[in-house]
Amino acid sequence: MKSLRSSFMLFLGLSLSLLFTFAALATRNPIQPSAAAPKYHTHFVYYDVQKMTTTTLFTIEGEWHAPNWTPDGRYIVSDQGDDLYRIPVSGADKGKPEKINVSQKMAATNDHALSWDGKQIAITSLAAPNRTPTGLHNVILIMNMDGSAAHEVHLGWLHGWSPNDKYLVYAQDQEGNFDIYRVDSDGSGELRMTTGKGRDDGPEFSADGKWVYFCSDRSGKFDGWRMPADGAGPGDKLVEKVTSGGDTQDWFPHISPDGKWLYTISYPMDHPDHSYIGDGMKIKMLRLQNGVGAKGAKLTTVRTFFGGQGSGNTGGWSPDSKKFAWTEYETIPEKLN
């Protein structure tokens, strides 16, 4: 019995010793919640149309999307996480993001565009619960460039403003089909612009305000199309194909302000769904003649890279039409602890 009691006391002593040791270690090295390290470095890249060269403007940690050049050429507006930022493109603060403090709760998406006068930002936010039957909650907000006076305008996946800043154009699945819509910037006067089968997406106005360019798979794969600014008409008879052929799914045709060039964000042919992120993404360009590809002209690849839809789903042209920007991703190797 004495031996059993001694054994028990020895076991108890060892247990308490181990407990105090672990407690001391925990106090000295407390376990912290692990912050998720950014998955990517993002390279902000631009193509110089005249020099036909590609240059990395700057690199930032994290996954950044859809660079929009401000009309004065001094900043790029981009999103990361739930927030919007403006980033100086030159000077001592080049490449240092400045958060835009939005006056309303917002969960940013990469669907954002600047008004042509440079005074406002429109963006699709996901922070609007119970607003759509699909549960996507994609509401368009308009705000001043500093984030003030943010207010809801309409539901939709925003892609652009009209040159007079009167209208917004966006894509939305409202009647069982993804189509292009236009609405006044105050949220009134919605106009359904396309009604054809297939997915229509990525609408943008031409600088003269006469046309809306968009991408569609209505011909079997994604290509660039355009229609008059008042819509495609009955049966979409007024749509006109702008790009064709090729070995890629060509999304989001972005028209230069001078109307001479178009570039696309192009996916590998076996990835028609634009949620893809990976290798084989391409930037393609087309010289325009009267708003469409010149006779015999085809999209030309200027860059192949690791990226995705957020690399440039809204326009990245500089105001002088000399260059355009997009984002490329570089995977950050996992650190072994």
Model-inferred region functions:
Residues 11-21:
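Bacterial N-terminal signal peptides
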Residues 30-52:
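Blade/loop signatures of beta-propeller domains
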Residues 34-39, 60-64, 76-85, 102-109, ...:
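A flexible loop/linker signature enriched in serine peptidases of the S9 family
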Residues 49-50, 89-93, 144-148, 184-188, ...:
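Short loop/turn segments that connect beta-strands within beta-propeller blades
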Residues 53-58, 97-102, 149-153, 189-194, ...:
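A short beta-strand motif characteristic of beta-propeller blades
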Residues 71-72, 116-117, 163-164, 207-208, ...:
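Residue-level detector of Asp-centered blade-edge/turn motifs that repeat once per structural unit
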Residues 76, 121, 165-168, 212, ...:
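Hydrophobic beta-strand positions that form the internal "hydrophobic ladder"
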